[in-house]
Amino acid sequence: MKKISSSLCWSLAGTALAVSATSCGSQKKETVQKPYNIVYIMTDDHTAQMMSCYDTRYIETPNLDRIARDGVRFTNSFVANSLSGPSRACLFTGKHSHANGFTDNTTCVFDGSQQTMPKLLQKAGYETAVIGKWHLESLPTGFDYWEIVPGQGDYYQPRFITMNNDTITKDGYLTNVITDMSLDWMENQRNKEKPFCLFIHHKAIHRNWLPELKYLSLYEDKTFPLPDNFYDTYEGREAAAAQEMSILQDMDIIYDTKMYRKDKDSRLKATYEDYIGRLKPEERKIYDAFYEPLIEEFYKKNPKGKELAEWKYQRYMRDYAKVVKSLDDNVGRVLDYLEEKGMLDNTLVVYTSDQGFYMGEHGWFDKRFMYEESMRTPLVM
């Protein structure tokens, strides 16, 4: 991660210095090439397995594939720390966690006084902005404009912290809202005399994978294939056996699979109630109308053992895929905007995630163990 991040920092900043000599007919003249704009899209927990330009077994991601088709797809991109805040700190600084000081999500506050990628870009003449997830505790530095979600953010009716340190609520689904704000900044708020670098940072596809309402029924008829090692026994691997990421044992029946009933309890039930409590009354009716038949069927069947593990896996995969669908839509909106404005050929579009994720491999979800599915991340530009 250090090698990739630091070299990327310098290569992005270096575009401001690019010049080219062109010829037109018989007349030769030197023209200064405008520095490339940069749109850096980062998502949370989006694993390469769930992008069709990397893996065709699961879903189609046509807009993400557009970036790969017209650019470069990195097949060996790995993070230095597969945890949201620490991974982002590595990205911005080009330093490993022990060197940048942000080693975990619970006790650390990012030191914004150190050198970062956006600061280098500012020095190179860029206008910089970040919109969406920040997750570094301190307020952003090195940005001319920012508006960030507090903590993990809310999928529904999301809250944002403004540059005035006010917390406001915006209407809609977070992935759409972040894109709306990003397009508005590019169209109406930036200095159009300067090159820009916009970091579009999504909460998606972070746990607990709450879908956009229009996609609630998507993938419900799809049966996702089980990974070959779904029933891993962890023989000879005590550390792996001790992990608390088991789909069967650790995936919360209410918070993660949405099998919510007031007379049932789970460790994360209250958090789930807070999340879906952000829906408007008319939205909650749509949400409940979809999940209530699933809930009734689940508690009637009351699956156990392998049947429960595979049922949880299918619910997990379907909800995760639905959130990816909204994300892919919004990547398409950004690409379409740049194309419509005649900016696409002069803009470097980067898409990546802060880490990978287990999609049932080793019987797991989450990312907190150092196997490839956790450390490997998609990177296209």
Predicted stretch roles:
Residues K2-A16, A21-M381:
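Formylglycine-dependent sulfatase
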